[in-house]
């Protein structure tokens, strides 16, 4: 006999919830109505106050457990709704130019990445809790021709009174009172030499790779009768469990993923060349888009709890 799943609807005085959107309102308690075989049942559901939502938004949920008090979560592979991380401060976007050696005053040689800035880093939109449900500043980067944009994209930028730009990214902040549309953001005004930054970017794509290159596996013997040189070896037991566990390290596509390198030191800011030198390596190859933001340091700009 096929199982009959209950249907749920969640309503409060300020919002109705559904998974088609990514935000929720923050009532401390709402009522949960469900029906099984046509029999209505009403239960109370307590929600975390970390959820945010604008009025009249609808968020569909596949199923809700009344006992979960901190998060609303769907089944495996579904959407998990939680509070988005807030940046430590406003940042900018840049372009990776390459790497070089930097000599400090005492003669120490430091490997640095040179990051340049194309035309852009202009505020295109300021989002507030009253209008969008959260505080954020949208920044545009890298000018391009009008015909490269769609009409909605062009209208969005024209509304802010800015030039056509290729990339748009948001910096979620606690307060956005100091920012206005069409405001120019300069790296030398936001950061100084010695500051720590978090840099995000897309890693270099390597294509399909084996276990040795992708996961640093050790290869097998090349002599002594060995028939497996670069093979994985055992990937699990036999009849029990009778399948390969999820997450097993195996050959597959390597690289081409978004990553973040934290707490990199700014070694030099050259305003004449419009470049900045960052200690260490950053994701991607020369020409890659990078996102630079103040480093999150617990106890300094991020609360310990």
From Swiss-Prot:
Q: Which residues lie in coiled coils?
A: none
| Superkingdom of the source species | Eukaryota
Share an example GO biological-process annotation for this protein.
translation
Localization per record: Plastid, Chloroplast
Span of chain positions assigned to the transit peptide in the UniProt entry: 1-84
Gene Ontology, cellular component aspect? chloroplast envelope; ribonucleoprotein complex; ribosome
User: Keyword annotations for this protein?
Assistant: Chloroplast, Plastid, Ribonucleoprotein, Ribosomal protein, RNA-binding, rRNA-binding, Transit peptide
- Gene3D superfamilies according to UniProt: 3.30.160.810, Translation factors
UniProt xrefs under InterPro entries: Ribosomal_uL3, Ribosomal_uL3_bac/org-type, Ribosomal_uL3_CS, Transl_B-barrel_sf
Gene Ontology molecular function: any one: rRNA binding
What is annotated about its quaternary structure and interactions? Component of the chloroplast large ribosomal subunit (LSU). Mature 70S chloroplast ribosomes of higher plants consist of a small (30S) and a large (50S) subunit. The 30S small subunit contains 1 molecule of ribosomal RNA (16S rRNA) and 24 different proteins. The 50S large subunit contains 3 rRNA molecules (23S, 5S and 4.5S rRNA) and 33 different proteins.
Q: Which family does it belong to?
A: Belongs to the universal ribosomal protein uL3 family.
Main role? Component of the chloroplast ribosome (chloro-ribosome), a dedicated translation machinery responsible for the synthesis of chloroplast genome-encoded proteins, including proteins of the transcription and translation machinery and components of the photosynthetic apparatus.
- In Swiss-Prot or TrEMBL terms, this protein is called Large ribosomal subunit protein uL3c
Name the gene for this chain: RPL3
